[in-house]
Each structure stands twice: as structure tokens, then as C-alpha cells.
Amino acid sequence: MTIKTLALQCRDAAQVVSQLSSQAKCALLQAMAAALEADAGTILAANARDLEAARAKGTASAMLDRLALDDKRLAGIAAALREVALLPDPVGRITREDVRPNGIRVQKVRVPLGVIAMIYEARPNVTADAAALCIKAGNGVILRGGSEAIHSNTAIARALQRALREANVPEAALTLVEDLRRETMLELLQLNDIVDLAIPRGGEGLIRFVAEHARVPVIKHYKGVCHLFVDASAEMELALRLLIDGKATRPSACNSLETLLVHADIAERFLPLAAQALRERKVELRGDAATRAVLPEIAPASDDDYAAEFLDLILAMRVVADLDTALAHIRQYGSDHTEVIATQDPDNAERFVQSLRSAVVMVNASSRFSDGGELGLGAEIGISTTRLHSYGPMGLEALTVERFVVRGEGQVRH
């Protein structure tokens, strides 16, 4: 079956999903969660095959962490589906209502986007998360995962499709692309008359390929080169907490810290504390000349290090003269994802917030809060770094659009 045929079937199924009541969608997602639990053995066995193949290829530890499933992670995925089921339904929500002087009633109403193509790598949880969010928002979804997770993705998709069938919803509403050739993905990205939005999540190469070749509208979920700037006024213990949580708790996450910027006035006090805490957690440190003057044992940092999304226990460090220098560094090397300042100076905090265009800006809070669930969205399909209708963590509402509904009693304009 061609990718165009699959997309057409998904579009037809999306029309069915768009007409489901909130109650029906809630029940469907609950059933999808139960299907994952029922198929746990099959899914974990499939994941073991993917992990074995990935290790044989020498896959990096960060990628292996993203790929791996276990009982706890699978239970978390099922729980996340149940949480999505209970979220408020954005479809049909009236966001504006007005009666014009001529008597027509004008409403802006949220409706599903239609068909969403999700293109991603090495994250089998995305198969379930994206399916749940897209269906809850009344859409169909085409899932194109990476070859490294093909067995996991297939097992998860089969379980979810069974729940769709049992609810009398066309299983094409959740379409998994099993032909992973690049030319097939390229054909999918050309189907702008069928697919309404493409969302790539993965490495820089994948996202650039999608952005450069798509005729379908694209919202990029670009790499997370996230910074922590420790201002001269920062409380040391607070800054250390932000640093350790941001770098060492889950370095493979896109909201983990990759670069530490430290104000020169406190570098001699803060850097030794930071280095000790990070070494205890096996973090490799790389720094500029000013950082190495305080920490001579660490490796030098290159321009490539400052632009890198390590997704590993590696941290680039730099001493900066002031807030302006920190901002200039972030503008040069950042990816518009998430930036953090540790400061007790309210003026500097406000200038940091106002001077950066990043999707998420934190003041005295960990970069790890850059997550849809943590920010009150309930769940997210990703973190948009594209300044379009959705910027930052994308929840259910971002998978809908507003349209006008006008009701009258025969009014004409002329």
C-alpha cells in the first residue's frame, strides 16, 4: 500500500474521530491504556529486540536511554494516556463571541487540525503519546518512527489499533508507517493536500531534512541547547540545585542543561562548588580559559561544544563578564528552547526574560520544568521551537485551530 493511500485512509478516519463526543474519546483513550497494559509482555519483548540491535551498532548511551522500555516506563505511558483522557476537550470550545451591529452572531470555535504526521526517532513512548493527544484533539495521526525502534513502535501501535477497532473507530486514525525508506518519508512530506501538519522530533539531521523537503506545514521541535546563567546576585545553594537537577537527573532529555554561564564576580566561589557536585554525578566538564583558570583540571571547550546538544553527562562552561555577555552567548549558541537565570536581582531577571526569544524562559526554576505536564498542559506532543501558532510545549489546544462560525437570520452585506 502506498504512503498516499495510507494518508487518504487516515484522512477519512480523522473525519470519524472529529465527530466523536468528549465522552467517547475519553472512553477510547482509557481502552487504549488498557490495551497497552494487556500487551505489556509483547511490547517489552519487542523493545528488547530493538535494544539488542542498537547495542550491536554501538548506539550512544543517550539514545539507548530514550529507546529503552521497562515495566515502570510502560506503566507510565499507560498512566499518561489515562491522564490525557481526563483532560478538558478543546474541540468545540468557543474562544470569542460577539453580536455585530447588523445582528449576526460571530463565534471563534476550536476545531481539529485534521491529519498530523509525527516523525520521530528512538522514542517508542511517542507512539502512544502522540496517538493519544492527536485523537483526543479529534485528529488522525500518521506515525513515522525511526528504524531503531521499529519493533517497539509496531507492538505499541498494534495494541492501540486494537482498542480503536473494538470501539468501532477506523484503525487508520492511527497509521504507523512501516516502510522506513527515506524516499517514503519524502513522499509523505509532499502530501500537503492530505496532511495538515508535520511535527518532527529527533536529531538535528532529521529536523533539517523535514524542514527542507516538506510541502506540508512543519512545526519543528529542534534541539535543546539549554543554558543556566548564574548571576552575581544568585544564591549559591539555589543555583546548585538548578544546575544539578537540570544536568544530572536525566541528561538525555531535551530540557536538560548543556551550558553553564557564570558571572565573573562569583566564578571563583561558585565554580569549585559546581565542579564538585557535578563530578560526584559523573558529569564531564569542559570550559573556556577563564573557567579553566579556576578549574585547571577540566578539558577546554570549543565552539562546537557551546552549540552542542550533548544529551549526555557532559557540560560546557563559560565565565561571562555580565548579563549582556550571557545574553549574547545564548543568542549565538542557543536553540530557542529553554533558558534559565539564577538571580536575586529583579531587574536582571526581567531583562533576561524580555531579551530572549526562547520558547521557555525560567527565573530561579529548573530547566526540567520545560514540559507540558509540568507547565499545566496535562501532556505534550513536543516542544515547538518554531514561532508559529504554537511555541514551547504543545498540548491539546495546539493540535486544534480556531475558525469562525457565523449565525444570522438572512442578513446580507449589500
UniProtKB/Swiss-Prot annotation:
Locations listed in the record: Cytoplasm
One term of GO molecular function: NADP binding
Reactions it catalyzes: L-glutamate 5-semialdehyde + phosphate + NADP(+) = L-glutamyl 5-phosphate + NADPH + H(+)
Keyword Repeat found: no
PROSITE patterns the UniProt entry points to: PROA
Pathway: Amino-acid biosynthesis; L-proline biosynthesis; L-glutamate 5-semialdehyde from L-glutamate: step 2/2
Listed GO CC annotations: cytoplasm
Family annotation (Pfam families): Aldedh
InterPro entries for this protein: Ald_DH/histidinol_DH (IPR016161), Ald_DH_C (IPR016163), Ald_DH_N (IPR016162), Aldehyde_DH_dom (IPR015590), G-glutamylP_reductase_CS (IPR020593), Glu-5-SA_DH (IPR012134), GPR_dom (IPR000965)
HAMAP family: ProA
Identification of the protein by name: Gamma-glutamyl phosphate reductase
Upper classification of the organism: Bacteria, Pseudomonadati, Pseudomonadota, Gammaproteobacteria, Lysobacterales
Gene responsible for this protein: proA
